[in-house]
Amino acid sequence: MFQIPVENLDNIRKVRKKVKGILVDIGLDSCKELLKDLKGFDPGEKYFHNTSWGDVSLWEPSGKKVRYRTKPYCCGLCKYSTKVLTSFKNHLHRYHEDEIDQELVIPCPNCVFASQPKVVGRHFRMFHAPVRKVQNYTVNILGETKSSRSDVISFTCLKCNFSNTLYYSMKKHVLVAHFHYLINSYFGLRTEEMGEQPKTNDTVSIEKIPPPDKYYCKKCNANASSQDALMYHILTSDIHRDLENKLRSVISEHIKRTGLLKQTHIAPKPAAHLAAPANGSAPSAPAQPPCFHLALPQNSPSPAAGQPVTVAQGAPGSLTHSPPAAGQSHMTLVSSPLPVGQNSLTLQPPAPQPVFLSHGVPLHQSVNPPVLPLSQPVGPVNKSVGTSVLPINQTVRPGVLPLTQPVGPINRPVGPGVLPVSPSVTPGVLQAVSPGVLSVSRAVPSGVLPAGQMTPAGQMTPAGVIPGQTATSGVLPTGQMVQSGVLPVGQTAPSRVLPPGQTAPLRVISAGQVVPSGLLSPNQTVSSSAVVPVNQGVNSGVLQLSQPVVSGVLPVGQPVRPGVLQLNQTVGTNILPVNQPVRPGASQNTTFLTSGSILRQLIPTGKQVNGIPTYTLAPVSVTLPVPPGGLATVAPPQMPIQLLPSGAAAPMAGSMPGMPSPPVLVNAAQSVFVQASSSAADTNQVLKQAKQWKTCPVCNELFPSNVYQVHMEVAHKHSESKSGEKLEPEKLAACAPFLKWMREKTVRCLSCKCLVSEEELIHHLLMHGLGCLFCPCTFHDIKGLSEHSRNRHLGKKKLPMDYSNRGFQLDVDANGNLLFPHLDFITILPKEKLGEREVYLAILAGIHSKSLVPVYVKVRPQAEGTPGSTGKRVSTCPFCFGPFVTTEAYELHLKERHHIMPTVHTVLKSPAFKCIHCCGVYTGNMTLAAIAVHLVRCRSAPKDSSSDLQAQPGFIHNSELLLVSGEVMHDSSFSVKRKLPDGHLGAEDQRHGEEQPPILNADAAPGPEKVTSVVPFKRQRNESRTEGPIVKDEALQILALDPKKYEGRSYEEKKQFLKDYFHKKPYPSKKEIELLSSLFWVWKIDVASFFGKRRYICMKAIKNHKPSVLLGFDMSELKNVKHRLNFEYEP
């Protein structure tokens, strides 16, 4: 802001004096007039003596000025202020109960403003009054009405995203849905008269209670006639404002500027229809675009077979449907609107289907599918789909599986947009084909899947594709009948193994090869086996294997198209006919093959038989037919496959159904070609996979990347998998508030202030104790925690509110059981502490921790015969990393070598160490340097107590030698003493050294020869001072005094030597400070600070006492003095 400069200051100053005099005269006159008035009024001596100066004065000049109170709630009667409204109300009730009406403050419900009730009411009317929506309707040419612009205020729940435009409805939703545990503290029902009447007259007694007194508020005893009235009182009364503050914390307010309001149609316009008739006669149901339609057909044909169910998007959680029909077997979910050019979708309801009942499932149990995903693709879509719709996966409840499903009349082509339903099986019942089977790349030729063909339900393959839907070339031919568990259609993996036009190598199974029945693909099962020859012709580029299957498996003997892998199977005795459906309750256990090829399952074993390499297949369980009462599964042993010459076949005889499966002869053509995929993307993927090769570290064999993992699991982990199948691991959840997850494979203990490695994690957890999530109990053993969880908290599968409200999560399945998606740590405990079973621990941090995801730990029992179990290290020295078998040897080592002994901190209740001489407990970071400094200054310690920490007497010429654990180690990266920059004097290194915590690792130093590689770099720098070298005699010549006679002396004598040295040479060099610190086992910073402190004392004494010096001394010595001298001449 510009200001005009002031001129004529002299004249203005002269005028000021006159103005001041005039004002003084005016004030004096006014005071005289007031004095005359006061003399005329005399209240008396009583009031004069009872009046103090503070009653008439405006402010006290001698008192301190009251500071501005920055907190929002300030008391006007005193100096109190606070940030919380409840604290302010408590203050008023305690100290100003009489004047509470003057200072009562209430908050604004819509903002942070708080004041007296009248002021808040005026504030609310001014700033938060609801805008009256005045709708000015204008009539256009068509006669339709348009509403004016209006701003809609909506409220949203932050926990479940529920939204509403009414604030009261929003508060009611939050209270009922998310704070339901608070309802019991407010809702009360008067039952005095009910207790006096007998049980048969309960309804009469309730009627006798007057309506206003039936319900009451437990907080303020307000009466209400109904639950809604009581709810309105709780949510709107000013008495329960604290409850509103809780509810408002999870409510978000949004102002939507909608412009012109959308038109509301009383009758919807005609839209695309979705019909689900029973037999083609049911009328189609009208639908609006923003709705989903669920067609629920019946098993029995009836006019009302299709019952439409409409789910509106506008009302979340609401479901309106017509009366459901009984005996529903499946559900069809269709997305609306349909593609362009299609007006309806017709689905024929299935006939009563035979179901396969697993063991323990009732015979008449109906299929009850859960909610289905909408338009979920089966596999990767390589090309544009056009107007066709991908199939939907139907989920079937475990234990019930329909075996046949008619596709409907498909002799004629169906228009685009047909939505077939391909039911898949829930994991645990049957294993469906992995994604990638249905690849939208080529159209299905005509004539595939004629009318009336039966396809097994649950087989998620192109066998259930209706013409018009795109699929791969591997589709079942005309008239082919496939039973589930025999062959998934579309298995075209051989084209991804070999490049185009290249013959299969010798690793492909040759003719006459013997394959045990258990060595099939991981998801393929064979009931029993017999031997049949190959009599099927193979087209160009087709790999064909002849797999004989007996007893309970339907044959597949149809010709296949290019790119399809087919197993030609013949039927032996006790085999169901082709057209015979499986009866409910039959004892066949059918599964699916994987979508990968047989060639992918060939795993080289690295061994040869007669010069021919052998291969293995992934092991799989074999199902044997048993009586209808149950199912039996036998795990076959893993056996290699021998490549025999072509034509060499071993005769086989049919085996009994109950006997184990004998080997199966698998014959193949002598020259087998594999046709590659025509698409460039598949070719690039094959070439990319072929470039990735890995070497097995066990057998030194080279494998492709897609075979290496399977080889490791099969060839080198078979014994471990066998042992793991015996007992199911136990899954537990616990709390460890003393741990902090730092990074991968590393955690930090907040109590001990140290890092804990993977090997010591479980011992550290048990040392501090694992806390129960549901109660304050703490356990120091796994067995105690397991028994406590089974006995006290059996059935509790949800986290407590303290954890769930803060965002802690545990992975659980549908039944509430713990899931372990990965393992962060794998540790070992002895069997006597753990038991026979493995234990999976999901460990959560404390309630106030920032890490919300648990750490998953697997604890395995240590076998008695495992190497290293007899010589297990019980304890490890945290200073020199020496292993000790017994606790006595460990404590003796600490006592003799480090002059400490383990103890427990009396306040922190954490492991600590104490001095054996003075019994003082070490606090902070424990290092050898801290022990050495304490021993030097400890009055109870003997003078030669630090001899164990000193190096052996001798002469070290090389400055690159480092002393670690009493042995001389050569390391060029470390120096004898820490080299410090100018001016730092070791403070920075000391700070860094103290920040580095010790690492507890039992396997850190198995021997003395590995000590230098294990000790951290910062610790070596810290301990280099305590493990100092022996200094040369030549280096001592630079010192002003000889320190040899003070070695091994007490701390006071060494301090006296430093004083003498200061009087001799008050300004030592850096080299002298380094030598003095290494000789007296003290820090260089301590030596430098000692000399600096003495110099400061001398300079202060010179300044205060002013010493004088007579002439006649050596003037050349003045050059060595660095402080100024004042020469005073005295005549």
Curated annotation (Swiss-Prot):
GO molecular function, one term: zinc ion binding
CDD domains according to UniProt: homeodomain
C2H2-type zinc finger segments: 73-96, 106-128, 155-178, 215-240, 694-716, 747-768, 770-793, 875-898, 913-937
UniProt keyword NADP present: no
Site of covalent link Glycyl lysine isopeptide (Lys-Gly) (interchain with G-Cter in SUMO2): 118, 146, 979, 1018, 1032
Regions crossing the membrane: none
UniProt xrefs under PROSITE patterns: ZINC_FINGER_C2H2_1, ZINC_FINGER_C2H2_2
UniProt biased composition (Low complexity): 274-285
Sites bearing Phosphoserine, chain numbering: 1024
Keywords annotated in UniProt: DNA-binding, Homeobox, Isopeptide bond, Metal-binding, Nucleus, Phosphoprotein, Repeat, Transcription, Transcription regulation, Ubl conjugation, Zinc, Zinc-finger
Residue ranges for the DNA-binding region feature of this UniProt entry: 1043-1102
Intrachain disulfide bonds: none
GO cellular component, one term: chromatin
GO biological process, one term: nervous system development
Main location: nucleus
SMART domains in the cross-refs: HOX (SM00389), ZnF_C2H2 (SM00355)
Segments of this protein annotated with the region Disordered: 274-329
A Pfam family per the record: ADNP_N
Covalent link (Glycyl lysine isopeptide (Lys-Gly) (interchain with G-Cter in SUMO1)) residue numbers: 1032
InterPro entries: ADNP/ADNP2, ADNP_Znf, HD, Homeodomain-like_sf, Znf_C2H2_type
Family: Belongs to the krueppel C2H2-type zinc-finger protein family.
Function according to Swiss-Prot or TrEMBL: May be involved in transcriptional regulation. May play a role in neuronal function; perhaps involved in protection of brain tissues from oxidative stress. May be involved in erythroid differentiation.
Quaternary structure note: May interact with SMARCA4/BRG1.
Annotated protein name in UniProt: Activity-dependent neuroprotector homeobox protein 2
Recorded name of the encoding gene: ADNP2
